[in-house]
């Protein structure tokens, strides 16, 4: 049995890669929460759909997340957490490409958001599942707690911030906000892999 270490907040942050993964979590949850809260409004304002149809199509983003998490539960053991995260990022990027095509039919946007949702689905559980391997089983309990805290920060405040920004710039910036958070996540993911590799080589 592994005895969890009772580390302070500062001690957890000193573990190589922990700060990076926390900001990754915040970035991912920011993307997911913006999609969950604002996709329906995007359909109304940008694609001209009525509220009922927009709400129906908006729910497909969340269904995409749920479906892909169900599927990932069966294939994660075969592919591994790292490949699942990379696959998720690729799917999100493909979805964004569909969303930024100018003057496109709203059906293409629906497909784009579904693909983004499917890409987002496996990322959250994959990061959590990889925590013991990345930072040690004895540290994982405390670090996962921090991950949840940063996840809630992103989920709570980013949709509010997006609402303020979109009121000034227009809600059509939503796909570009997706891209913004995806780029942050990708860059941090690359640095995290280098940091973890260096840490393991030292050990």
Where are these regions (language model features)?
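Juxtamembrane intracellular "pre-TM" segments in multi-pass secondary transporters
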Residues: 1-21
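Paired small-residue
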Residues: 95, 107-115
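A late C-terminal transmembrane helix in Major Facilitator Superfamily
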Residues: 132-171
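Extracytoplasmic gate region of multi-pass secondary transporters
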Residues: 16-59, 63-66
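Intracellular juxtamembrane helix-capping segments at the cytosolic ends
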Residues: 122-135
């Amino acid at each position: 049995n592994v005895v969890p270490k009772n580390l302070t907040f500062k001690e957890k942050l000193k573990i190589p890669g922990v700060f990076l993964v926390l900001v990754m979590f915040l970035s991912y949850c920011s993307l997911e929460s913006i999609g969950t809260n604002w996709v329906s409004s995007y359909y109304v304002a940008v694609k001209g759909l009525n509220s009922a149809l927009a709400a129906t199509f908006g729910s497909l983003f969340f269904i995409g997340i749920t479906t892909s998490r169900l599927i990932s539960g069966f294939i994660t053991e075969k592919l591994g957490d790292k490949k699942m995260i990379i696959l998720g990022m690729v799917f999100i990027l493909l979805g964004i490409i569909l969303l930024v095509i100018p003057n496109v039919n709203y059906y293409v946007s629906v497909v784009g958001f579904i693909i983004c949702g499917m890409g987002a689905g496996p990322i959250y559980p994959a990061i959590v599942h990889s925590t013991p391997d990345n930072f040690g089983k004895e540290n994982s309990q405390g670090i996962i707690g921090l991950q949840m805290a940063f996840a809630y920060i992103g989920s709570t405040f980013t949709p509010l911030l997006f609402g303020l920004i979109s009121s000034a710039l227009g809600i059509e910036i939503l796909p570009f906000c997706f891209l913004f958070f995806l780029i942050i996540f990708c860059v941090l993911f690359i640095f995290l892999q280098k940091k973890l590799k260096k840490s393991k080589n030292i050990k």
